Amino acid sequence: QLMKEGKLHYGGGKCELIRVGAMDDIDIALGHHTQAGCDMSIMNGTSNGFINKTVTFTGRSAHAAGMPHHGVDALNAATSAMVNMALQQESYRDEDTVRVHYFIQDGGTAVNVIADHVTMQVCARAKTPEAYKDASMKVDRSLRAAAMATGCGLHIESMAGYMSEMANPHIEVLKSVLDDIAAEGKYTNVK
């Protein structure tokens, strides 16, 4: 809802904090994510980078029972796009941990009206920039194919998300700081 109202511009909280200037006077952030059940943790894992997209299919409304042939169904385009994106799954390498998520944000006005406007949110994420750029390209291709097949207009707005995060094996300095500030056993070193 906040994105729809224009109050948030990015799909990630940290991106939004940077956009509004909340990080302007901060040189480094050692802690950047919450984890339930653990006061502090050192994560020696990775985190996928991603690209977010706001997608709009534009069709032509018509009465769904009386004159559906006069309409161009934007909801059909969105449905086709979701199938197309799902069918790309086997083209991704397992080691790239590619994930593509999507949902329909606005999908019509009534059951008896051919939808002339559908908005979707899509996120393409992967372990490396090369992999999530490849996934993003395949998402765009899937969206364009759906628009072409249904005769709908298409607008894709791609927004930068996070870069991929790789583990830093030289984390002993941070561990010693946590030893000083945290009670015994109040942090974990996840490998």
What is each of the regions a protein language model found here?
Residues 1-4, 159-164, 191:
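Conserved short loop/turn motifs at secondary-structure junctions
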Residues 32-34, 104, 124, 158:
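A cross-domain feature marking catalytic cores of carbohydrate-active enzymes
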Residues 55-59, 119-126, 156-160:
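Short, hydrophobic beta-strand segments
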